[in-house]
Amino acid sequence: MPLPDTMFCAQQIHIPPELPDILKQFTKAAIRTQPADVLRWSAGYFSALSRGDPLPVKDRMEMPTATQKTDTGLTQGLLKVLHKQCHHKRYVELTDLEQKWKNLCLPKEKFKALLQLDPCENKIKWINFLALGCSMLGGSLNTALKHLCEILTDDPEGGPARIPFKTFSYVYRYLARLDSDVSPLETESYLASLKENIDARKNGMIGLSDFFFPKRKLLESIENSEDVGH
C-alpha cells in the first residue's frame, strides 16, 4: 500500500539563504558560457564550486565562428577558461586536464589530436598545452601568438594585449620547433628583430601592434606606399 504524500507547510521548509544567489550566479554563468551539454557542464561547475576551484565559466559570450556553428569546438574563450583553471600549476596531469576539457563539453578527439602535436605521457607543461591550443585556433604562428597575448594579457579587452617578451619568445620557439617549415635560423632572426623594439621601450613587454598585422591593414599599407612612389 503506497504511503500517503506528506504535506509540509511553509514554516517547515528550510531554504538555505545562500541558495538564491548560487542559482543566480549559475544561471549567469550558463548564459555566458553557452555549454553544448548543459548537464555535463553543470556537473563540472558545481564540482569546482564545492572545491573552491576556478569555475568553468567564460568571461563573456562568444559568437561561434563559421567552422563552429554548434559552438562545440575550441575557442579563445574556452581556452582562457582552461588557463584560469590551470595556470597556477607549472605541470598539469593529463587526467585532470582531460576532465576539465570534458566539463567544457569539448570533443575528446580534439583533445587527443592536440596532444599528438607534442606527445607526452602523464603530464604536460601548462604553457606548452596553452601554446598548442592557440596553434589549433590559428593557422599561422603569428595568429597563434595573437591568441596567446589576448589570453595572457592583463590589459583590458581591446587594449594592446601586452605580455612579457620572455613568455612570447618561449612560446614562439616552442611552436616553431614543431613546424618543419620554420628553420631555427628564421626563428632567431625574427625574434631578434622584435627584441630591438622591445629593448628600446625598456619595459620588456610585447603587444599585438609589435608583430600582428591584419591582412587588410597590410594591403592598405602596400597600396599607400605604391601611391607615394607614383
Swiss-Prot record:
One of its GO terms (cellular component) is nucleoplasm. GO terms for molecular function: identical protein binding. SUPFAM superfamilies: Dimerization-anchoring domain of cAMP-dependent PK regulatory subunit. Belongs to the ropporin family. Keywords: Cell projection, Cilium, Flagellum, Ubl conjugation. The keyword Ubl conjugation applies. Functions as part of axonemal radial spoke complexes that play an important part in the motility of sperm and cilia. Important for male fertility. With ROPN1, involved in fibrous sheath integrity and sperm motility, plays a role in PKA-dependent signaling processes required for spermatozoa capacitation. Residues 17-46 form the RIIa domain. InterPro entries: ROP_DD (IPR047844). This is Ropporin-1-like protein. Sumoylated, sumoylation decreases upon spermatozoa capacitation conditions. The gene is ROPN1L. Component of the axonemal radial spoke complex 1 (RS1), at least composed of spoke head proteins RSPH1, RSPH3, RSPH9 and the cilia-specific component RSPH4A or sperm-specific component RSPH6A, spoke stalk proteins RSPH14, DNAJB13, DYDC1, ROPN1L and NME5, and the anchor protein IQUB. Interacts with FSCB; the interaction increases upon spermatozoa capacitation conditions. May interact with AKAP3. Interacts with CFAP61. It is found in: Cell projection, Cilium, Flagellum; Cell projection, Cilium. One of its GO terms (biological process) is regulation of protein phosphorylation. Its main location: other. CDD domains: DD_ROP.
